[in-house]
């Protein structure tokens, strides 16, 4: 952190993304992540972003000529759990990890914001997490890919218009095949739209339709 701070100066935000649980044999667990979180906060980092899994260690052996892909083992599964994961599903799956780290950081006398992510696909879930004090910031990847205008729609009071991610991991499947990543909720829509960027095979649009045009 200190080396990075010297490089960018005092007016630049520096945070860290780390795992609340590595989900691999002999890997770090929440107890380790809590310790690291407190040390990161004491060091002066501007935010702590908590994730889970995504390690290469238990990934399946790739086919000849293909790269190792991390989301094929249990650790990778926990990084991007689909809607059929288990009885809990992907919804807010990592929140307890962020909550434990935030609690320890606050008890250590630090106010460093803690970011949580992972299966947070609705405004209600995001707000409830913040109200309970389990995190300070909500991050969303798949939900933002499903609807890049998610935040604008909610702010405008048009939450019913949000194109909600259903966590089938269609996007992850494309990534695993090393194809351009899109969302199945919009990548076949209005393909004849003038000037729309398309995938290499021309079958998918690469950018979601603009909300104003819908």
Positions of predicted regions on the chain:
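Flavin-dependent oxidoreductase catalytic cores
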Residues: 1-214
């Amino acid at each position: 952190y200190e080396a990075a701070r010297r490089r960018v100066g005092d007016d630049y935000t520096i945070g860290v993304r780390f795992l609340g649980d590595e989900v691999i044999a002999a890997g770090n667990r929440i107890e380790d992540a809590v310790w690291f979180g407190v040390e990161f906060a004491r060091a002066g980092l501007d935010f702590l972003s908590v994730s889970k899994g995504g390690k290469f260690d238990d990934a399946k052996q790739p086919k000849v000529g293909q790269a190792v892909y991390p989301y094929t083992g249990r650790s990778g599964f926990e990084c991007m759990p689909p809607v059929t994961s288990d009885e809990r599903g992907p919804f807010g799956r990592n929140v307890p990890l962020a909550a434990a780290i935030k609690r320890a950081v606050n008890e250590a006398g630090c106010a460093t914001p803690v970011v949580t992510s992972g299966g947070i696909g609705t405004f209600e879930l995001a707000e409830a997490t913040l109200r309970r004090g389990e995190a300070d910031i909500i991050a969303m990847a798949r939900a933002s890919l499903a609807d890049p205008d998610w935040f604008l729609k909610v702010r405008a009071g048009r939450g019913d218009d949000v194109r909600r991610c259903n966590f089938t991991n269609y996007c992850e499947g494309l990534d695993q095949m090393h194809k351009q990543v899109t969302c199945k909720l919009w990548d076949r829509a209005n393909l004849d739209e003038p000037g729309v960027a398309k995938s290499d095979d021309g079958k998918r649009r690469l950018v979601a339709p603009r909300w104003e045009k819908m």
